[in-house]
């Protein structure tokens, strides 16, 4: 049976689609700008689901991050991609999927030199089923109060993904300002991306 090649959508600096490329060829030291998304999932108590990326992941293995991320397929509706990836990565059904940071964009280099270079709209959603993570995607997970997550990221940013570090001050500006996270994120954003 032929193996399915996952494609990512390549973008120009204005965010316009310029083509596609196999996902396996995109995340390198010279990563092209491409389309992705992040999602922050909440439970009925208002806690956020954070996940620790599996050790086998190509980028940022073993670090804590937001609930999940992914790449929409060419011509796939972004909300459909969010639902698809929640099921693939976490065995999770979602409700109330809402776009909260439509213009989020970042570039970061991990310890192995692999670059993420994404226009990455950020969504929030509510869990509609129990979490059943796939071990090849998620090493572990926790439900945490956002007010506890923010100082943890501010004090140990190296333990978290750079996109989470950059997203939290935008999602929770009132808490980030008091925790030092705004300064941590500003410093991370100021690091040249090589």
From Swiss-Prot:
Known cofactor(s): Mg(2+); Mn(2+)
Residues given in the record as Mg(2+) binding sites: 89
Cofactor note: Binds 1 Mg(2+) ion per subunit. The magnesium ion binds only when substrate is bound.
Main location: cytoplasm
Entry-linked SUPFAM superfamilies: Nudix (SSF55811)
Domain Nudix hydrolase: 32-166
Pathway linked to the protein: Isoprenoid biosynthesis; dimethylallyl diphosphate biosynthesis; dimethylallyl diphosphate from isopentenyl diphosphate: step 1/1
Binding site for Mn(2+): 27, 34, 71, 116, 118
One of the protein's GO biological processes: isoprenoid biosynthetic process
Catalytic activity as recorded in UniProt: isopentenyl diphosphate = dimethylallyl diphosphate
Places the protein is found: Cytoplasm
Catalytic residue positions: 69, 118
Gene Ontology molecular-function annotations: isopentenyl-diphosphate delta-isomerase activity; metal ion binding
GO cellular component: cytoplasm
NCBIfam families: IPP_isom_1 (TIGR02150), PRK03759.1 (NF002995)
Function: Catalyzes the 1,3-allylic rearrangement of the homoallylic substrate isopentenyl (IPP) to its highly electrophilic allylic isomer, dimethylallyl diphosphate (DMAPP).
Annotated protein name in UniProt: Isopentenyl-diphosphate Delta-isomerase
UniProt lineage: Bacteria, Bacillati, Actinomycetota, Actinomycetes, Micrococcales
């Amino acid at each position: 049976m032929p193996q399915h090649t996952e494609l990512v959508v390549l973008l120009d600096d204005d965010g316009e689609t310029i083509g596609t490329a196999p996902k396996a060829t995109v995340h390198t030291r010279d990563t092209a700008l491409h389309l992705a998304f992040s999602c922050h999932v909440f439970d009925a108590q208002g806690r956020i689901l954070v996940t620790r990326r599996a050790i086998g992941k190509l980028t940022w293995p073993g670090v804590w991050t937001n609930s999940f991320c992914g790449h929409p397929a060419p011509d796939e509706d972004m909300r459909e991609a969010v639902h698809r990836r929640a099921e693939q990565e976490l065995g999770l059904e979602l409700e109330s999927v809402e776009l909260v940071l439509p213009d989020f964009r970042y570039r970061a280099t991990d310890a192995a030199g692999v670059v993420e270079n994404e226009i990455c709209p950020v969504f929030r959603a509510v869990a509609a089923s129990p979490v059943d993570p796939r071990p090849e995607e998620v090493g572990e997970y926790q439900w945490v109060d956002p007010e506890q997550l923010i100082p943890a990221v501010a004090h140990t940013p190296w333990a978290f993904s750079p996109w989470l570090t950059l997203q939290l001050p935008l999602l929770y500006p009132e808490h980030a300002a008091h925790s030092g996270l705004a300064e941590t994120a500003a410093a991370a954003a100021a690091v040249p991306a090589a």
